Amino acid sequence: AQTVILTSHIRPDGDSIGSTLGLMHYLREQGKDARVLIDDEIPRIFRILPGIEQIERPAEGTRYTADLLIVCDVELKRTGAVLDAVDAVRVLNIDHHVTNDEAAEYLYLNPDYAATCEIMHDLVHAMGGSFSLDAATCFYTGMATDTGFFRFSNTTPHTMRAAADLIEIGVKPNIISVAMEMKSYDEVMAQV
């Protein structure tokens, strides 16, 4: 596939944004025409992620074409308007949620992983690929947020090894942690 559109769920989180952006960076490094469409606002805490400004929201009435639509971190029906707006030759769904309805034409589903970004890490390695710092930063962010910064019970030795691999590339966990834990004034006041 030469043209690839990546998407994820409405109400995007670290794993959905990290997996789509990280894979976008990787695919572009392989010479592919890759873009990210997400049918929702992107939370401000993710503004530190490389390429965040390139995430597009599908424009009403606009048709998008691609050789491949990759739906990350969610089943197809939770992508908002994206699924209806994209004409793709093939649809691939990559997810770690056991609740996935398995409706995609092609599905890579593995609930043993803590995050879709952890799956992406292994898929890139399985293809013999390597990570740029931009892709590694995005994938690390998704793994960190879906594991509560490696505190939740879904954190496995494999998760930690994958995170360590990304840190060796140059990811700065402290910068990501501080950015993800920042709260807006309204969020702080809501807790008072």
Description of each model-found segment:
Residues 1-10, 22-28, 102-192:
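A structured phosphate/pyrophosphate-recognition subdomain
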Residues 13, 23, 46, 70, ...:
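Divalent metal-coordination and catalytic microenvironments
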Residues 37-39, 72, 94-96, 111, ...:
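Generic beta-sheet signal
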Residues 4-65:
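Anionic-ligand anchoring segments at beta-strand to alpha-helix junctions in alpha/beta enzyme folds, i.e.
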Residues 50-52, 58-106:
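Active-site cofactor/cluster-binding pocket
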Residues 32, 89, 129:
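Short glycine/serine/threonine/alanine-rich loop segments
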